[in-house]
Amino acid sequence: MSLQSREVFDASQTMPTTVNEVLQLKPLPHDRFSAEPVSSTGRRTIYGGQVAAQALRAASLTVADGRVAHSMHAYFLRAGDASRPIELRVERDRDGGRYSGRRVSALQDDAVILSLACSFARPKQGAEFQAVQLPKVQPPGELTTYQLNASRTFDLEARVPQDPDPWYRWPARLWLRIRNTLPEDPNVRACGVVFLSDLCTGLSRAPQVEKAGLMPSLDHAVWLHRAGNPNDWLLVDLNPLGTSGGRGIYSGHIFDEGGALLASLTQESLFDVPHDASDQR
């Protein structure tokens, strides 16, 4: 579901859509919401990070004030049509003393395009520890803007530091931010982080990636450890874990510029390398 696929864009659409617009949902009866199509994207299919963020936003609108998203797991089941609205149906699995669990189905024409499970918690002070540290990379202020396909579509800015590990087609380590200001609501900001989390792929560092073609997302999990502001520069650092059975999996971390670990993520994608008959023995 990455925006870095070889998607056909409508060049006549020149004004990027804001992420804030994407997260504006129309409430419907019975814990349902509607996300209207955003025609200015110029896309034929929906970016997976968009619908995941919209589903998480819908869930957040059904929990008590003060409960903030801390994890989500989405399955991408069908490609979505960017010209059509999305209906988001929320199921209230549990509301406990501190935690709330939700499931969300995103549908178009009664067909599920995404299924998401997520959890919210009332913030609490606790032990602070992170084993992974911000990589030693150039700060965004020393870099020039990198043109992602997504930057033509949404109000995003990317900058790519020098990377000692080679990558193919998609940068696997990059600074990202949302340009237009999001509300200070911590759940809206969490949705903004989720929106950014699916823009590239750690499989760009995997062996034989140049033979794999498109690598649409199958499922995507994000754990939100600390509050962050996606209007500030965030470093997304992605690394492959392995490929097998026509699929690949990678993990990643998202840091703020000060080095705080804001989120961790894991994604499985298609990784279909054509079988070479000459390799048979």
Region locations from a protein language model:
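Terminal targeting signals and extreme-terminal segments of soluble enzymes
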Residues: L3-R281
